[in-house]
Amino acid sequence: MNFYQIKSPLTQITEEKTAGYIGALSEAFGEEFKRVSLEEYLHDDFSLLYVASGGSEGYFIEVFEQLKDKPCIILTSGDSNSLAASMEILSFLKQHGAEGEILHGSVTAIAERIRSLRNAYRAKAALKGKKIGVPGLADAATVV
């Protein structure tokens, strides 16, 4: 599972603390989480945006134009004002007509939600461009 990490340049959050949280989440999910570049994040069909600290919303606004066409699944650890920054980012997304969701809670609950979201995105991608009809009805409509 890929994630793009944003954090305030002023934060004192350590790589060890981030690695500990991401490691616990990887274990609960049953798959390794890999930090990727912004370019990799943008080209991945389904990946997470990890808000590692408060103050990250300023950086997010700087890269928003690149992200606006992709739903933002925002992962928060709850440490270092991560949740507050995530809420600011979600509010910004909503104000600009973009999609987003904050994942917050126990690592087990977050892992389950990620699994559900990824399955939904995979199903949506598999159905993209397909025509689905309802056979047997006199006025069966085709859903595009």
Name the predicted role of every residue range:
Residues 1-144:
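An N-terminal assembly and electron-transfer interface module characteristic of large anaerobic redox
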